[in-house]
């Protein structure tokens, strides 16, 4: 019987929860925006973890995203140390932060769909009169 939920997935999910907490509570950099950890992909050998983040609010410009990624890269050592303490792993993966644009794309697509539906209602309303 194959495992439906592998160890790397479980570790990735736990890392996502722990990193969300640590970024919100432990990083005291005032330049850091409202960061949401959307996913963590852990390599099979647990040597690397790709952490996907979004930046909420007005910080949606490319410069703000880059600045937030730089801050997180600078704090990666501290975050690894804290993860090691809280998760009790023998070796904590190297953290690589990436911006997850899927949330922004989803919002843009929703707006396009809503606009198309509104225009369709407007056109069908004129056709019936």
Swiss-Prot record:
InterPro entries found in the cross-reference section: KH_dom-like_a/b, RbfA, RbfA_dom_sf, Ribosome-bd_factorA_CS
Entry's transmembrane regions: none
Claim: rRNA-binding is one of the keywords in the record: no
Entry GO terms, CC: cytosol
Organism, as annotated: Azotobacter vinelandii (strain DJ / ATCC BAA-1303)
Domain of life: Bacteria
Keywords: Cytoplasm, Ribosome biogenesis
Function: One of several proteins that assist in the late maturation steps of the functional core of the 30S ribosomal subunit. Associates with free 30S ribosomal subunits (but not with 30S subunits that are part of 70S ribosomes or polysomes). Required for efficient processing of 16S rRNA. May interact with the 5'-terminal helix region of 16S rRNA.
Matching PANTHER family: RIBOSOME-BINDING FACTOR A, CHLOROPLASTIC-RELATED
Protein name in UniProt: Ribosome-binding factor A
Family to which this protein belongs: Belongs to the RbfA family.
Subunit structure: Monomer. Binds 30S ribosomal subunits, but not 50S ribosomal subunits or 70S ribosomes.
GO biological process, one term: maturation of SSU-rRNA
Protein localization: Cytoplasm
NCBIfam families per record: rbfA
UniProt-recorded Gene Ontology molecular function terms: ribosomal small subunit binding
């Amino acid at each position: 019987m194959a495992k439906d939920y592998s160890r790397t997935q479980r570790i990735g999910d736990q890392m996502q929860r722990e990193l969300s907490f640590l970024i919100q509570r432990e990083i005291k950099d005032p330049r850091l925006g409202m960061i949401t950890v959307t996913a963590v992909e852990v390599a099979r050998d647990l040597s690397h973890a790709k952490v996907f983040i979004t930046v909420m609010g007005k910080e949606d410009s490319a410069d703000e995203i880059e600045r937030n990624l730089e801050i997180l890269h600078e704090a990666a050592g501290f975050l690894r140390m804290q993860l090691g303490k809280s998760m009790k792993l023998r070796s904590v993966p190297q953290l690589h932060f990436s911006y997850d644009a899927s949330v922004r794309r989803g919002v843009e697509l929703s707006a396009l769909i809503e606009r198309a539906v509104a225009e369709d209602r407007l056109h069908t309303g004129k056709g019936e009169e």
